[in-house]
A protein has these predicted regions:
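Acidic/polar, glycine-enriched structural segments that form the non-catalytic walls/loops
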Residues: 1-78, 151-152, 162-173
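Alpha-helical support elements that line or immediately flank enzyme active sites
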Residues: 75-108
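Active-site-adjacent bridging/hinge elements
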Residues: 54-68, 105-117, 190-203
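Hydrophobic core/packing positions within alpha-helical solenoid repeats
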Residues: 88-91, 141, 161
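An acidic intrinsically disordered interaction segment
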Residues: 41-60, 96-108, 180-191
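Catalytic-loop motifs flanking and including active-site residues across diverse enzymes
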Residues: 83-86, 133-137
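The feature captures the catalytic groove of carbohydrate-active enzymes
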Residues: 1-6, 10-18, 115-136, 142-159, ...
Length: 213
């Protein structure tokens, strides 16, 4: 039941109080240290840029294995491959956080390679089989090259880009074919294949097939 109340205590000028409320007892000797650790992890919201940084951090997640992901959205979306590559530059490079870009891309690269090698996925990156995902991956890497430099990008992701292009060129993707005109084609009649992925009765509402742009 809702039970309003208040707490009173005497403090000296300049003294700080750390208050903790929970259903179980806390070790009070460690509360101040815990509070400071939480403060240090948070972004200050004292200007517009810091507010954007704080908002971006809400989509940065890391699991117990140390794999880094971008959450597709709240309240129920999981890390999705397409959403990851589309949003990754804006949620990392734009706020000068190259390390998280590289961490999330490391996780994504593992998933991409497992998909291309037809191995079971060991990362929690969903919908990686969609035909535009490898193209968005290359686009995200291009954004990294613009910010971090071509040489560094080539060193870190050159082989991945080459392997993705080879995968597509050799017609190994289950729903992305390289045509004689040099464009890539996909079939979206049975399932949604792009970001316009709303469905009704298990079928795409907007069946996007052909040379999707």
């Amino acid at each position: 039941l809702y039970a309003p109340g208040y707490f009173e205590m005497s403090i000296r000028k300049g003294e700080s109080i750390v208050f903790a409320a929970s259903t179980s007892a806390s070790k009070t000797s460690g509360l101040k240290k815990l509070f400071q650790e939480e403060v240090d992890e948070r972004s200050p919201r004292d200007n517009f840029f810091h507010c954007l940084v704080n908002a971006a951090h809400q989509f940065h997640v890391e699991d117990k294995n140390g794999d880094a992901y971008i959450l597709a959205g709240y309240p129920w979306f999981k890390p999705r491959a397409r959403d990851t590559f589309i949003s990754l530059p804006g949620l990392t490079l734009s706020i000068e956080e190259y390390e998280f870009f590289e961490a999330a891309m490391k996780t994504a690269e593992k998933g991409l390679r497992e998909f291309m090698e037809q191995k079971p996925l060991t990362v929690k990156l969903y919908e990686i089989e969609h035909p535009d995902v490898p193209l968005w991956a290359i686009w995200a890497i291009q954004q990294y090259a613009k910010e971090a430099g071509v040489d560094k990008c080539l060193e870190k992701y050159g082989q991945l880009v080459w392997d993705i292009l080879h995968f597509i060129k050799e017609q190994q993707h289950p729903n992305l074919t390289l045509e004689d005109n040099g464009l890539v084609k996909t079939d979206g009649k049975q399932q949604a294949v792009t970001w316009m992925n709303s469905t009704a009765n298990g079928r795409p509402i907007v069946p996007r097939s052909g040379f999707v742009v």
